[in-house]
Amino acid sequence: FNFSVFECDFESFTEAIHNCKWYEQSLLQNKVLIRKQPLNLDEYINPPHGAHYEEYSWWTTSNYKDKIFFASNHRDGMSSLCKYVSRELGCKLYRFRISKGEEAYYGCTFFCCNKGKDERAILAYMEDRWVFWQEGELLPFENPAYYSNRFIKKRLNYDILVEYLGKMGINLFDIDSNVTNCMTFERIKWDREE
C-alpha cells in the first residue's frame, strides 16, 4: 500500500492539482474528472500492474486536521505528482510504501521531501535478493539501530513504518476514519483518445 502525507491545507492541495500543467489539456477536453466522493481506500491497496487509467484521492480527517492524505492506484504512489505538489505549495511530504509480504513486489520504503526536494530516503525491498539503501540525514523519529540488522528485510519493514508513523502522531489504522473532505481524480480517457 502506497500513501503520502502532506503538511498543507486541503484547499491549497486541491488548487495545486487543478493547476497542474500535466492535466491542463485533459481537463479542458473532459478526459479527467475531479470530484468530491466518499473515500474508498480499498481501491488503492495492491494496485494493478501495467498501463491503466490513473485514479487518486486526497482527503482530510478530523483526527489529523493539519494533514492531507493521498493514495493512488499506481504502484509508485504517483511520486512525481507528489513531489510537484510539495514544490508548488512549499510543504513537507512523507511517502510510504508499506508491505506485509503478500504482494508481488515486496518491500517497504520511506521518503521525506521538503518543498519538492528530497531530504531522506530509506528502502528495503526484494529483487533477486534483499536490497537496503538509505540517503539523507536521519529524522528525529528514526531508530538507526534498525538499519544495521543482519537481516536486510528487517531493517525497514511494516512494523518499523507503523512505529515511525506513530512517532509522527499518525495511526495507520485510522487515516481513513472521520473523513471531513475527500476529492478524487479519475482519468476516463487517454490524452491521445478522441
Label the model's feature ranges:
Residues N40-E194:
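Charged interaction segments
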Residues F1-L27:
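Short, extreme N-terminal segment that most often corresponds to the first beta-strand
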Residues C8-D9, S26, K36-Q37, Y53, ...:
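Aromatic-residue detector
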Residues I17-I34, E88-L93:
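A common structural junction motif
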